[in-house]
């Protein structure tokens, strides 16, 4: 990551990456037992940090609704509601509803990441399509 990247953005990206990886693990691993609960709580924490840290960021889309917040921030609010509902249903042992809320939150995470990577002007897009190619080219040039 760029040394000039603001701390809230680094926190947001790190938490989102952790949530993406932990969520993939949860989807592929067995769904019962202490390990599932432990990884689930870590995923929930990463998702919560991702959502909360988004309020320290501008949308980067040039649009704002209220007090600098945009539709992307509304997704963060919905994500936090989804997390609360998923936890509620897991504790109530209603695993069908738990899975639905979790699947929705994870799909939102993936969709937000795809949008952030695809839209020019966003930090993730710049990292993947500007900074990373520069690093690869510079590293390759040093080999020759």
Please give the residue ranges for each predicted region.
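Alpha-helical membrane insertion/targeting regions
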Residues: 1-144
């Amino acid at each position: 990551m760029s040394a000039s990247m603001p701390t809230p953005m680094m926190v947001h990206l790190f938490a989102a990456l952790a949530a993406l990886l932990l969520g993939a693990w949860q989807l592929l691993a067995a769904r019962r037992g202490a390990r599932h609960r432990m990884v689930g709580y870590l995923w929930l924490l990463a998702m919560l940090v991702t959502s909360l840290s988004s309020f320290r960021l501008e949308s980067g889309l040039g649009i704002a609704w209220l007090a600098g917040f945009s539709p992307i921030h509304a997704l963060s609010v919905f994500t936090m509601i989804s997390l609360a509902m998923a936890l509620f249903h897991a504790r109530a042992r209603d695993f069908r509803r738990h899975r639905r809320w979790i699947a929705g939150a994870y799909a939102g995470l993936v969709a937000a990441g795809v949008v952030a990577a695809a839209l020019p002007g966003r930090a993730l897009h710049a990292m993947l399509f500007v900074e990373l190619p520069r690093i690869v080219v510079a590293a390759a040039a040093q080999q020759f």
